[in-house]
């Protein structure tokens, strides 16, 4: 059993989603958004760090998964996003969590089956996969999708390494 915290970083709104993985079963534990209403960036980064730290303390995850920075048209926005990611990652590292990063396209491909999926499609599939009664907020849905992707990737990596080990021993199942 593992608890995974997924983070969809943003300098104004950072989504988070927490799930438990037991074998192939995924269970929703919580989600939401850290909203920063202050205007100066250093204060927003402080709020992101504090918010992520609080979530880690509350849910005690085993793994931390976060979306990678994508190339934005606006360089200033990309820099702010990178700084928001940094604040969240530092919170995870300060709590001794292993950090995993996933590209947005990989997350959409894993959860929806299409790397160019729309936000509404991601919300719908997250709702379906986690058996939620309603669509989560967009940023929270993205964070949950990141956590789901981590479960999928880590499960596949475990299966591949077990297959290689069996092959090395002369057994292939």
Swiss-Prot record:
PROSITE patterns: RUVC. Mg(2+) 2 binds at residue 67. One of its GO terms (cellular component) is cytoplasm. It catalyses: Endonucleolytic cleavage at a junction such as a reciprocal single-stranded crossover between two homologous DNA duplexes (Holliday junction). Binds 2 Mg(2+) ion per subunit. Pfam families: RuvC. This is Crossover junction endodeoxyribonuclease RuvC. It comes from Cronobacter sakazakii (strain ATCC BAA-894). The lineage of its organism: Bacteria, Pseudomonadati, Pseudomonadota, Gammaproteobacteria, Enterobacterales.
